[in-house]
Amino acid sequence: MKKILLSISLLALAYTASANVPVIKSDPKIEAQVEQTLKKLTLEEKIGQMMELVTDLFGANDKNGVFYIDEHKTDSILSRYKIGSILNAPNTCAPTAKQWEKYIAQIQKISMKRIGIPCVFGLDQNHGSTYTQGGTLFPQNINVAATFNREIARRSAEATAYETRAVSIPWTYSPTVDLGRDARWPRIWENFGEDCYLSSEMGK
């Protein structure tokens, strides 16, 4: 019995130790900057940095149906809520690269003035750069998983990352590696299916 308990304890210890290994090696200079920035933030600002709003809230459509950033509305949102990140394209439509540059520049200018920290933009680019006009589209991840081809998964993800970064957006909500074990889940097509091994391999 003692041997079993000892074995379990050692396994738990090994698991805990491996869980604390960072994926990317930390940079002491960057860590120091982060700590300095955190010390300057109020509790309200820290809470705001953990919030995310959709792009639609920062503007409206003009008479031609083209979205624009409303600087008064944006200033009001950022000064009141200190938002840390913004999600997806306005009206769930795909802006051009120039439109993205303009939207982001306008919001960042106000964010830097109000909080001193740039907002992070994220897009649901789960199967290609779907939120940019002229972007490359790929099959949904459930279809990619059906190929059992890791190379296809990797190369389509690389292309998506490249095209997303090309429009000044550093973050995509992909890959979705939660297991699809309930067909009622509304994101079922965005993952790699119900098999944990397949999902882990395709999501590497």
Where are the regions that the model predicts?
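N-terminal beta-rich core of secreted/periplasmic extracellular enzymes
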Residues: 20-204
